[in-house]
Amino acid sequence: MTEEPRPRAPITESAVLAWLETTAAAVEAGEVSAQELIDLLGELRRASAACADASDWLLLAAREGGASLRQIAPVFGKGYVRAPAARLEKLHRQAQTSGQWLAILRHKQTA
């Protein structure tokens, strides 16, 4: 019996840095126009917002799954529980569960 593959993030830090190196080289070589850079900027900013939304969903889902703030804190940086606690407090003004947050994201996408 084979195990189901574990969920993975759709984008990684190393993939972004590799893309940045390639893009920077193309820009330095004069192969990318200003308009193309502006288009990429817009695309990257939208993707960044989508990553932030996904991060918020994962935070809610982890808490629902029983993760403590102390367990979650290291991914926020210095290991302080204040950061995820503050983010949860802000999220809870809009959604109490990961399901509610996903519904908000779906609505936002169709609006």
Where in the sequence are the language-model features?
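General nucleic-acid-binding
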Residues: 1-35
